[in-house]
Every structure is written in C-alpha cells, then in structure tokens.
From Swiss-Prot:
This is Pre-mRNA polyadenylation factor fip1. Residues 1-169, 282-338 are annotated as: Disordered. Residues 283-332 have a biased composition (Gly residues). GO terms for biological process: mRNA processing. It comes from the Eukaryota. Signal peptide: none annotated. Keywords: mRNA processing, Nucleus. PANTHER family: FIP1-LIKE 1 PROTEIN, PRE-MRNA 3'-END-PROCESSING FACTOR FIP1. It is found in: Nucleus. Residues 106-118 have a biased composition (Low complexity). Residues 1-12, 38-56 have a biased composition (Acidic residues).
Length: 338
C-alpha cells in the first residue's frame, strides 16, 4: 500500500486525492524524507565501505598485466648520462682523415765522461773471502778416551757415572752432544754408521771382483803359462778363478750371452754364484769337442777328459763314465789290450 501511495503522490493530480489523504500527505512526505535521508546515509556508508575495499584491493593486489615498477639503478643512470656513440658512418669518415704519427727521437747517449765509474781498488783492499773450515767427514779423537769419536763406546769407555757428566742434575746436554743428540741416539747413530760403511765397502769389493772377472783382469795364477803365443796361432785360454778350468774368450762370450738370454745379469751377480753358473754351463759343453786331444796308447785313442761316449768329460764326481784321467774306464771302445 505504501508503494501505491507513493506512486499516487508522484503521478496522480492533487484534486484526485481524498481529503483525509490530503491531510496525511505532509506527514507522509516528512516520513518519506526521513526514510530517504536514512537510505541515503546507508548508501553513503556502503559506498564508503566499497571505496575502502577498492582502495585496499588496489594497494595489495596489482593487476596481472601491469608492468613491475622499475627500480632505479646507479649504473643505468650513468649509462643514460653518457653521450650517444656516433654511428658507423661517422666512424668511417673520421678514419679516412689522415693522422700524423709523432716521430720518436732516439735518446742521445750520455758521454763516457759523465757516466759514474766504479772505484778501482786492488784486491787486497777488500775483506778476505771467508770459507768454512769444518770437515763434515772428520772423525776426531776424543781427548779422554784416545779413540775416534765414531769408535767410542759409551758403556766401555765411560764405565762409571763420574765419567758421564751429562747425567748430573742441572747439566746442559747440549754442552756434550751436538745437533740434538743424546747418549742413546748417539750410540745408535754410531752403530748405524759402522754398519753402513761396512756394507758399502763389501759392495765395492764385490763390484771390483766382478769387474776384474768379467774383463779377465785377474792376476796370473801360479803354474799358468806366462809367455804369450806367437801371432797367427789360436788365442790362449784365459786363466780362470780357483776351482775353474781355463776359459777361452769365445767361450766366455758365449757363457755371458747364455746367462743374459736366461734373464740373469752377470754384472749384478756375486763371484761365487757366477762361478757356479759358469761351471754348470761348462759341464754340459766340456765333452763335446774333447775327443781331438792327444790320447794314450791302449785306450782306443780317447782323450784324457773323455767320458761315456765322449760326453760329460768335464763334470766332476761322476760315477759311470765320469771325469777320469784313465779315460773312459768302464765305457765303450777302450781299445785292445796288448
């Protein structure tokens, strides 16, 4: 009914309104104004709330298509402040223009009279050259024992406590031992030095013996032929070591080549092992060409060193057909007894 009344108030003529309604019209208008004011205030409040919400959304949520704000950078500012580079055409035009290169003038050498000269002094005017006089390999004699230092025994040469002053309370051990040694480390050092020197001497002796044996420079053995054979004859057999027969040079070369082919180094072998290998190799080859030596009558013309079948004549301690000066005793072809 209120809506209809409102419509009537707006659209119907005034005379069509009844009297009672005409009296109530001012009151209705005042009520309507108050309602409109209330509704207007509510709408304003809603608009303010919506505006507040819109402002909040704008601040917190940026639209997805909006570009991010550019952060100022000092380098970008410097680049913007720099002048623009000229184009390639400008560069080409500038490069065409000839440039004058400055000439470098050679510096004139100073005269010899202006140069500072070193003072000319005789050699005696300078201090003498000082060189160390310490012999690092020296082995001086200890004054109290009368023995070389490396041969001094701490227990036998210093038997009592009075002879060992470094053991006394308050004594400085550096007054008696150098380079951080003490009584025990010095004794072990001396022992190691003696062992090393002995080992080095033994190795040198073995090396010298091996070199002499390989080069056949051994002194002549008593009973060996002294004078040399005349030219044109076969080379004499070289004197061997005790316990070995004389060795021809070609046989020695063959023995060395055979040892090297078996993987042995003759220069690193001691003399005893070399002799054993040489005897073993000679034992297998001794009877091969021994049948041409002069034989004895009554033994079939066999050589003195021939064994069974002319083989193994140089092998000692053979049982059947071994080395025997009677020549092949018990073997075949003894010859005919007369």
């Amino acid at each position: 009914m209120m809506m209809e009344d409102d419509d009537d108030d707006f659209y119907d003529p005034a005379d069509a309104v009844p009297i009672n309604q005409a009296q109530d019209a001012p009151q209705n208008q005042s009520n309507e104004k108050s309602q409109e004011l209330n509704e207007g205030e509510e709408q304003e409040e809603e608009i303010e709330v919506e505006e507040d919400e819109d402002d909040f959304n704008i601040i917190t949520e940026a639209p997805p298509d909006a570009p991010p704000p550019e952060v100022p950078h000092p380098r970008h500012a410097n680049l913007r402040a720099e002048p623009q580079r000229p184009s390639s055409a400008d560069i080409s035009t500038k490069s065409v223009t000839p440039t004058v290169t400055p000439k470098l003038e050679a510096a004139t050498p100073a005269p010899a009279s202006a140069r500072p000269t070193a003072p000319q002094k005789p050699g005696s005017a300078y201090p003498p050259v000082q060189a160390s006089t310490i012999d690092v390999n020296a082995n001086p004699v200890h004054p109290s024992t009368g023995k070389p230092i490396l041969s001094t025994d701490m227990d036998s040469d210093f038997p009592t406590e009075d002879d060992k002053p470094w053991r006394r309370p308050g004594s400085d051990i550096s007054d008696y031992f150098n380079y951080g040694f003490d009584e025990f480390t010095w004794a072990s050092y001396v022992l190691k030095q003696q062992e090393l020197r002995k080992e080095v001497q033994d190795q040198k002796k073995q090396l010298d013996d091996m070199q002499n044996f390989l080069t056949m420079g051994l002194p002549p053995i008593p009973g060996a032929p002294g004078p040399a054979a005349p030219p044109g004859s076969a080379p004499p057999a070289l004197p061997g070591m005790p316990g070995m027969p004389d060795i021809a040079p070609d046989m020695m070369q063959g023995m060395l080549a055979s040892m090297m082919s078996q993987g042995m180094d003759p220069s690193s072998m001691d003399p005893m092992s070399f002799m054993q290998h040489a005897q073993a190799m000679m034992g297998g080859q001794g009877g091969a060409g021994a049948g041409q030596q002069q034989g004895q009558p009554g033994f079939g013309g066999q050589s003195q060193n021939s064994g069974f079948g002319g083989q193994g004549g140089g092998q000692p301690h053979m049982g059947f057909g071994g080395y025997d000066q009677r020549g092949g005793f018990g073997g075949r072809g003894r010859g005919r007894r007369w």
